[in-house]
From Swiss-Prot:
One of its GO terms (cellular component) is proton-transporting ATP synthase complex. It is a peripheral membrane protein. NCBIfam families: atpA, PRK13343.1. It comes from Herpetosiphon aurantiacus (strain ATCC 23779 / DSM 785 / 114-95). InterPro entries: ATP_synth_asu-like_sf, ATP_synth_asu_C, ATP_synth_asu_C_sf, ATP_synth_F1_a_nt-bd_dom, ATP_synth_F1_asu, ATPase_a/bsu_AS, ATPase_F1/V1/A1_a/bsu_N, ATPase_F1/V1/A1_a/bsu_N_sf. Keywords: ATP synthesis, ATP-binding, Cell membrane, CF(1), Hydrogen ion transport, Ion transport, Membrane, Nucleotide-binding, Translocase, Transport. This is ATP synthase subunit alpha. The keyword Metal-binding does not apply. F-type ATPases have 2 components, CF(1) - the catalytic core - and CF(0) - the membrane proton channel. CF(1) has five subunits: alpha(3), beta(3), gamma(1), delta(1), epsilon(1). CF(0) has three main subunits: a(1), b(2) and c(9-12). The alpha and beta chains form an alternating ring which encloses part of the gamma chain. CF(1) is attached to CF(0) by a central stalk formed by the gamma and epsilon chains, while a peripheral stalk is formed by the delta and b chains. Its EC number is 7.1.2.2. The lineage of its organism: Bacteria, Bacillati, Chloroflexota, Chloroflexia, Herpetosiphonales.
């Protein structure tokens, strides 16, 4: 049978009208115009959102690398590459995903170590999280919040007594390198066992060995059961270091808004530590300069204040209508030669609700934690302090601040009146009392007991060198002979008349049996 032209034409029409493998979809594709130092300029991409996730297809290896569109210019898009950019070449295809960068969140992340994209780093297998959250999010509004009213017990006597932190607060930890900033944060995480808190530790630009040491410490103290570690170490790209705190905050927001289960209880309070935001600002400066954004003071871009304010404003205490959860943020800033008036420190001080200032001179003098009581402050934490702690710690901060001034003055004065001498000796005893070894948090009831003893003059005849011996032995005596005192303080959170009477009896009895000379 001969095939006619009409047959061929009808078959062609039929094949054209027949659908081919599903519905066709439009894909937004561009090409790499130039690449270097982790930044790619892309031509041909249309309809790209700011901070949109882009997919780079490497021609040589065929592998896919992700990037973020940060500069949307007239004829090209500048993107930072999240990963190995050395294999990306000019002419490689780039596809827009239509998604803003997201991170896995939820129950599955507890006890895990992840990178800022939620990829596991601990060798414990993949994370099967069913939910993701965008890393950038607008902070809760004023109406959605409520005032800070519940304490975060750090277990550090000096902080819980003098600079109390509340759930939903932003409290800056600031000081020179090697003054114990990370130690305070880790101690606080360790003390959250049984306190109904989930902790997120974000390491930005740290050495891998230091992060591994921190994780080991948390594991040894049983703290990884309720902790998530987000790590963008110094060897990672500046882009990954830049998004790390936002990823950690998104993970914490899931806890605040939805909650996770810890030891069979639903927990909606999160504690997040940013260690540290100085390195975060440096990473952002690097990214901005590579994107050719105009530099400002200290070569930081003009929006470096907004970089940290939009992050720290996401820490909040939500109202009961909105679930009543909270995020408490402890950002860390490293200063140079105790200079708190530098650009980044002043920015973060103005954003946060107070600062814990650690001084290298105090640290090397053996005062650890090396807390400078004079310029450390908590603007909202006192309203979250328990009544028992308020009762015993009320005048203590003023006494210590006055002692530091008097001690400096006394160095040049030979004759001191009896009142000044007594005040200096009392200050020395209080300073000694506040010394505390690392990774040994103190329970609230023990803190209240020893501060009541000090505040009522029972330490005035104890030599300064024996204060720590007295403290240790008295706690042991209370736990064995007057355990009901600690239980009453822990449950009632107040110092009742009966509790005070029992305390007075206990300390009198203890001082009759033990001698500290």
């Amino acid at each position: 049978m001969a095939v006619t032209a009409e047959d061929i034409l009808s078959r062609l029409k039929a094949s054209i009208q027949q659908p081919v493998g599903g519905d066709p979809t439009a894909v937004n594709v561009g090409t790499v115009a130039s690449v270097g130092d982790g930044v790619a300029r892309i031509s041909g991409l249309r309809d790209v959102m700011a901070s949109e996730l882009l997919e780079f297809k490497q021609t040589k290896s065929g592998e896919t690398v992700m990037g973020i569109a940060l500069n949307l210019e007239k004829d090209n898009v500048a993107a930072v590459i999240l990963g190995d950019y050395l294999e990306i070449e000019e002419g490689d295809l780039v596809r827009s995903t239509g998604k803003i960068i997201s991170v896995p969140v939820g129950q599955e992340l507890l006890g895990r170590v992840v990178d800022p994209l939620g990829r596991p780093l601990d060798g414990k297998g993949p994370i099967s999280a069913s939910k993701t959250r965008e890393v950038e999010r607008i902070a809760p509004g004023v109406i959605e919040r409520k005032s800070v009213s519940q304490p975060v017990q750090t277990g550090i006597l000096a902080i819980d007594a003098l600079i109390p932190i509340g759930r939903g607060q932003r409290e800056l930890i600031i000081g020179d390198r090697q003054t114990g900033k990370t130690a305070i944060a880790i101690d606080t995480i360790i003390n959250q066992r049984g306190q109904g808190m989930v902790c997120v530790y974000v390491a930005i630009g740290q050495k891998r060995s230091k992060v591994a040491q921190t994780i080991t410490t948390l594991e040894q103290n049983g703290a990884m059961d309720y902790t998530i570690v987000v790590n963008a170490s110094a060897s990672e790209s500046a882009a990954l270091q830049y998004i790390a705190p936002y990823s950690g905050c998104a993970i914490a927001e899931e806890v605040m808004e939805v909650g996770v289960t810890v030891d069979g209880n639903l927990v909606k309070d999160a504690l997040i530590i940013y260690d540290d935001l100085s390195k975060h600002a440096v990473a952002y400066r690097q990214v901005s300069l590579l994107l050719r954004r105009p530099p400002g003071r200290e070569a930081y871009p003009g929006d470096v204040f907004y970089l940290h304010s939009r992050l720290l404003e996401r820490a909040a205490r939500l109202s009961e209508v909105n679930g009543g959860g909270s995020i408490t943020a402890l950002p860390i800033i490293e200063t140079q030669a105790n200079d708190v008036s530098a650009y980044i420190p002043t920015n973060v001080i103005s954003i946060t609700d107070g600062q814990i200032f650690l001084e290298s001179d105090l640290f090397y003098a053996g005062q650890r934690p090396a807390l400078n009581v004079g310029i450390s402050v908590s603007r909202v934490g006192s309203s979250a302090q328990t009544k028992a702690m308020k009762t015993v710690a009320g005048k203590m901060k003023l006494e210590l601040a006055q002692f530091r001034e008097l001690a400096a003055f006394a160095m040049f004065a030979s004759d001191l009146d009896a009142g000044t001498k007594a005040q200096i000796e009392r200050g020395q005893r209080l300073s000694e009392l506040l010394k505390q070894p690392q990774y040994q948090p103190i329970a609230l009831e023990d803190q209240v007991i020893i501060l009541w003893v000090a505040g009522n003059g029972f330490l005035d005849d104890v030599p300064v060198a024996r204060i720590n011996d007295f403290k240790r032995d008295f706690w042991q005596f209370i736990h064995s002979s007057y355990a009901e005192v600690g239980r009453a303080i822990a449950s009632e959170k107040v110092l009742s008349e009966a509790t005070i009477a029992s305390l007075r009896k206990a300390v009198t009895e203890f001082k009759q049996t033990a001698s500290y000379k």
